[in-house]
C-alpha cells in the first residue's frame, strides 16, 4: 500500500510540473499577444485589449499594466496577482523569478507572486 501511495504521489508531482508551461517568447501584434513555450510551440493568444500593456515576462509568468493596475499572469493569461500602480511605481525589469520597480527614489524587488522581497534607495 505504501508503494502504491508513493508511486501515485510521484505521478501527481510529475503531472503538476508538466502542466506548468514555460514562456520562451511573447510575440506582440497590433491586437494580440501570442505566447510561445521553450519548444517554439504556441501556448495561446491573448487580446491586447483584455491584457493591457505588456511590461515583461519571466519563465512562467508575465506582467501587464491595465488601467491603474499591474497584473501578474501565468502562461495562459490567468491573473495570479493584481497590484496597484500607485503602490508599485513603474516596472523597470522582469526576470525569470522577480519583478523590479521604481517609485520615487526607491527601487523595489517583488517575487513572481507579488510579494515585496527587497527595497533600497536609488543611486540617482
Language-model regions: role of each:
Residues 20-28, 33-34, 57-66, 70-71, ...:
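Short beta-strand elements that form the blades of beta-propeller/WD-repeat-like
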Residues 20-25, 42-53:
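Beta-strand-rich domains and repeat architectures in extracellular enzymes and scaffolds
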Residues 3-16:
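Sec-dependent N-terminal signal peptides
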Residues 16-18, 36-37:
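Short, low-complexity, intrinsically disordered N-terminal segments
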Residues 46-63, 81-101, 117-124:
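Residue-level detector of conserved, function-critical positions
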Residues 32-48, 71-84, 109-122:
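Surface-exposed loop/turn elements that mediate protein-protein interactions on large endomembrane-trafficking
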